[in-house]
Amino acid sequence: MDSSPAFPTPHDACILACRKCIVACESVLNTVGSSFPPQWAQAVNLCTASIRSCEVAVEELTLASSVAAQTCALCAVLCRACADECAQLPGPWTWVSAACQHAAKECHTVALTPARVN
């Protein structure tokens, strides 16, 4: 009998959502390059911040770090801001918005989850 949970743990769901957010943000940033309309500047900056915070969140969760919840709390704030900003833009930005919104939700869940006892 398989003893693994039927559903991913909040930590695993957060890692997966963060990885998808990283892919979405990197994809759109590679598409727009360095020449983009001025009204996209905030979205570009928030995508960059989301990538960094998601990378750190994934690393801290993977290491079962004692600061994983705090890292995820910050990641949730940045990803939510990115999602809100990207939702106002056309085309591929809507995909980014959805990915960041999902990462924000999963990170928020981890931030509110009691720490694992190893």
Where are each of the predicted segments found?
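Amphipathic alpha-helical hairpins
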Residues: 1-118
